[in-house]
Amino acid sequence: MNGGLAVIGDLYKSTVFHLCDWIDSESAYAVRHDLGLPDRGVLIGAAIRGKPPSAELRPEQKDSDSLPDYTVLDPLLKALLEEHQSPEELSQHGTDPALAERVMGLLRRAEFKRRQAPPVLKLSQRAFGSGWRMPIAARG
């Protein structure tokens, strides 16, 4: 991964969706012009924005096959990562405890992937990379 940089690696998926919509909106035309990009028309397009998110590890795989909708997942991740809430605390506020435990387990099991990924531009208090580390051999 020589020279890689994960520019949007610290953004939640729902934020990326909103950012893509904004980039193609009229309100972004002036910014696009200042960056030397076409200041009119579609840059990202509905075909890309409408494609279901996927890790693309196997044919026809979609994130929704194994993860909740991002309107549910992103607030849960924010609570776990940025607000340091435990699955037990989240269950006291109406979150399904089994879902919170499952997501926390997925985070732990995917730590090795984050160590292999390119550096992330830090945008939040607890970005993956510099602000978030778990032991690679963590169980749970």
Role assignments for model-derived ranges:
Residues 1-140:
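ATP/NTP-dependent adenylation/nucleotidyl-transfer catalytic domains that generate, transfer
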